[in-house]
């Protein structure tokens, strides 16, 4: 959504003098540091899409004034920075299927450094060259990226189809059950009553309590939950 500044911003804000380019970038980089916790210069720059050529001076100024602190992170080759007010984060509990444009995975180099999770959007990649699928969603579980799924919504059949799935090395066994629950939830808010899992998805290998038939079959679930069909 877009609107005119005078209809959105308070009058007091509009009456403030316009900051210089350097001052504006310094303020944005300071906000980036607050939001990201520990970050490289490239991470800080990318948060507000600041041109790479314009960040060296404001970062030096932020270091000099003590707003950000240079630090070293084990296994990171680049210099990192920590905001002076940074606090240790809380352990995250919960699950979510992430959009390719989610802030957690938007800046791919940072995602790979933090989670050892290499992720690319392959919609423009020729089908025979795709590694994981056309429109793959990362799966976040308890603060870790543990899987990725290639999904297709068959509106005519009322089915959310899991075409492919991959669990990351070291993913806990409960990741499969957590993924199924999130897929059910997604099918529900998409208005699709059924969930189908293709053989290539291989989710069933981590779900020994579910039985795979040679013909499409539904697995009994609790009332109000989607039906799951495993295809072989």
Q: Where are the regions a protein language model picked out?
A:
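Long, low-complexity intrinsically disordered regions
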Residues: 1-97, 102-105, 110, 117, ...
């Amino acid at each position: 959504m877009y609107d005119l500044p005078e209809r959105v911003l308070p009058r007091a804000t509009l009456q403030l003098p316009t900051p210089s380019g350097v001052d504006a970038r310094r303020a944005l980089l300071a906000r980036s540091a607050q939001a990201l916790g520990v970050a490289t210069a490239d991470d800080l720059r990318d948060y507000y899409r600041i041109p790479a050529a314009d960040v060296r001076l404001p970062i030096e100024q932020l270091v000099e004034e003590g707003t950000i602190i240079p630090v070293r992170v084990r296994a990171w080759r680049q210099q990192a920075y920590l905001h002076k007010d940074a606090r240790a984060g809380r352990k995250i509990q919960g699950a979510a299927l992430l959009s390719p444009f989610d802030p957690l995975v938007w800046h791919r180099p940072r995602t790979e450094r933090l989670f050892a999770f290499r992720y690319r959007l392959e919609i423009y990649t020729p089908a025979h060259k795709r590694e994981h699928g056309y429109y793959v969603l990362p799966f976040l579980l308890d603060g870790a990226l543990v899987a990725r799924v290639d999904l297709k919504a068959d509106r005519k059949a009322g089915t959310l189809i899991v075409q492919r799935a991959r669990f990351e090395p070291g993913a806990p066994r409960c990741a499969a059950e957590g993924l199924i629950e999130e897929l059910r939830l997604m099918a529900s808010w998409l208005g699709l009553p059924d969930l189908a899992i293709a053989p290539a998805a291989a989710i069933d290998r981590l779900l020994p309590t579910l039985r795979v038939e040679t013909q499409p079959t539904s697995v009994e679930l609790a009332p109000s939950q989607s039906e799951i069909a495993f295809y072989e």
